[in-house]
Amino acid sequence: MTPALKEATTKGICFSSLPNTMESDKMLCMESPRTVDEKLKGGDTFSQMLGFPTPEPTLNTNFVNLKHFASPQASKHFQTVLLMSSNSTLNKYNENYNQKKVMESNCSKLKNVLCNGSSIQLSKICPSHSENEFIKKELSDTTSQCMKDIQIVLDSNLTKDANVDRLHLQNCKWYQKNALLDKFTDTKIKKGLLQCTQKKIGPSHSDVPTSSSAAEKEQEVNARLLHCVSKQKILLSQARRTQKHLQMLLAKHVVKHYGQQMKFSMKHQLPTMKIFHEPTTVLSNSLLEHTEIKPEVNILASENKFWDDTNNGFSQCTAAEIQRFALSATGLLSHVEEGLDSDATDSSSDDELDEYTIRKNVAVNSSTEWKWLVDRAQVGSRWTWLQAQISELEYKIQQLTDIHRQIRASKGIVILEECQLPKDILKKQIQFSNQAVSLNTSVNSQVPQRSEEPLPEHDFEMSPSSPTLLLRNIEKQSAQLTEIINSLIAPLNLSPTSSPLSSKSCSHKCLANGISRSASENLDELSSSSSWLLNQKHSKKRRKDRTRLKSPSLAIMSTAARTRPLQSFHKRKLYRLSPTFYWTPETLPSKEAFLSSTQTPYTGSPFSWDNWEQSSRSHLLREQVSKLDSSFHPVLSLPSEIPLHLHFETLFKKTDMKGELAENQFVGDCLISPPPVQGTSSLNQWRNGYSPICKPQIRSQPSVQLLQGRKKRHLSETALAGERTRFEEFAFQRSEPGSHCNFTAVSNANVTSRTQNPSSQNTSRRRLRSESSYDIDNIVIPMSLVAPAKLEKLQYKEILTPRWRKVVLQPLDEHNLNKEEIEDLSDDVFSLRHRKYEEREQARWSLWEQSKWHRRNNRAYSKNVEGQDLVLKEHSSELGSAQQGTAESPFELPAESHSLCAQDSLSLNDGQEDKSLRWERRAFPLKDEDTAALLCQDERKDQTGGTSTAFHDEVFCSTTPESGHPPKMQLDGMEEYKSFGIGVTNVKRNR
């Protein structure tokens, strides 16, 4: 761990940041990569990498000093200055030779060649000790040709080296490939130089022996120069690779450093932080589906204010300090990115990338632009949804019209049989037609004769045994069979969808909206097939009409279609539209099903499930709001269009206003602001230490159980009064004009003032809790509540089962068997036995007479009937005694009874004239006189029935058995009614 990180962990929060500009060029002034690795182990060099202020190290004099190498201020062509010291190898050779001007000219030419070929400028070669002048001589052709060869070799090597560097930057393998390529370039340069000198200098040496020593010296100088240039090139490539490697190490260290800074700061603050304050119940996050500003934006947009310790838990940490830390981190990371990525630098050769502007993380001081973008995106998404719905509806309408057209085209014609009229109707029609024809001219005089002739033939044909009727029935059956066979066998020109077999095979193919595919394809073929079926049916109908014998009367008659039998009917297809399936809260998929359905490797994290669950809940909540308010659409309406009264209703329903202080101390923070101030509400929630997204994850399970337990408790009247005043405070604060931030600030101020005296509130809370809580061991239940609920134990009732009992068999009495019962067949016994039946019959007769006279509205008859009933009851006992006394002389009984009746009638006429006498008893079989009297009475009734009144309807004649005279009529203004008992009723019934 770096010393800066150790200091950060020991001191607490101390954000150590790196400077915005790095002096990484100092690390390149080293001899080899080995020295880099050795010096990386030390602390000074590492601090130089990180940009900490340290004294600059002394540079090696034997190495080339590279100024501004690979720095952002460098140009596209690297400018390198070679500063040679007095101990260099080139100066040793200059001491031994006296040709200074020749070497200067050669060096100047070599400098120009190298500048044009490899873009490397050799500025000065300064000898320290030897300053003698040399003789100027022109360069020979061999040296110029050698310089050209050196230029070609350098150009090829430089291009190869550039390609190799690109490969190394892509594959990140520096040491293996570059070592081999460096050796390859060294050997190639040496071989090319030797070949040039052998070819060009060899023949000139023999011709000019005086200048051999000068040529050899020039060759050695050129070889040394070429060796130095190649070595410098190798060192340049190594420096470039080392720079890239150091930049990558620096980027890794910076990322690790800032990650550890943030991690250790959070670890330091978490023990001192309080648990994120959460209210008892908050409206669901999906009720107000607002956009959330990122924490970085909140950090940049926040002002330099001290955060309260009770709200967020950060101790003495200002927003400005964190802002400085964030700015330094972003600046350093962007600088490292520019060093590593070629697209992010200004030295890119691509024209398109030069025009690309790098987007910076600009602080958003006001969220108006962000909010405008979010609103624009919401409106655009709703517009696309509406267009998709309209296009889908148009497609469905077109599909339904196609199906309707297909159904109309494939609908067959219902063919009814002709009605067969009955024979009598046929005859009448034929007669009417004959009469109409007879009225015509004499030219058509033969038409009735022809119409009369088919009558016997038609009757013969309509008979069940006629051969024509049998042939007609056979023809009907054969026509039906051929129709069935034709319907089963599909014709060749029909489409596959119209045949029953293909429809079965294609039944499983359905469209997205539940309509069968066969119903929406091949409409032309179906219309042609339907026309073919219609033609076939019409041809069959014509054939049947030709074979069928018709009478001219059948065409004239018009009958109803419901009375005619069905001849043929084309069975139509059944189309079913499957209903659309909507998700309900019961049918929502579970978390396991959602995670198992997704197959991407990133679905293991709970963020995807949380986002999906939040979106599904928001969709269901929007549907509920649309049910409550008809002006709100679940899709087209924006979240800001949710009515405000719904917010308050859900708040009052869900928030426990009767809870304790710990539950209600953050009511102001949990309230969701109206839609126009959404950004400030989310910022306040982030400042208070929680966000709507991470809220369900932070809340622990015991705290939820504790809150649920507190909700179920009952508080006393004092607690209710305190909460009522608290609620009035809350209502007053809500009614004040101002933004949501002011409201939350007031509520937070109230919360802080309440938390200043926790001891008194804790004691009062404990007292209220002890008063309101129940002790399960000391609960007294009155007996009046327990008595009806007490269970009574039923007594055991023994069920009696049948048993066998012993029966003592006793012999039957013999004297009872010996005695024989003798039936008494005397008349007295029979009369006594039948007396009760006679009384019943008399009562029935009297009731019948009463109802008969009542229908005729006769009041006198009702009185007579009442008197008659009374007389019958009075003399019933006398009649019984008279029957017993006169059993031997049955013919004397009617006379005595008649005399009694006469006496009674006289007495009744004196007292009550409207009462009738009792009936006269009859002895059966009747005598001839009695039957003659009855017949005479009937004849008189028939004669006087039309003119007599209601009192003269029935007149009964009674005679005594001794005299054969007819009975006398009373002429005192009222007729004498006499009853003849059972005999009269029997005679009337017989008639």
UniProtKB/Swiss-Prot annotation:
Encoding gene, per UniProt annotation: Kansl1l
Name the UniProt record assigns to this protein: KAT8 regulatory NSL complex subunit 1-like protein
Species for this entry: Mus musculus (Mouse)
Record flagged with keyword Ubl conjugation: yes
InterPro entries on file: NSL1, PEHE_dom
Compositionally biased residues, Basic and acidic residues: 450-461
SMART domains recorded: PEHE
Highest taxon above the source species: Eukaryota
Positions of post-translational Phosphoserine modification: 463
A GO cellular-component term linked to this record: intracellular membrane-bounded organelle
Region of interest (Disordered), residue spans: 443-462, 749-770
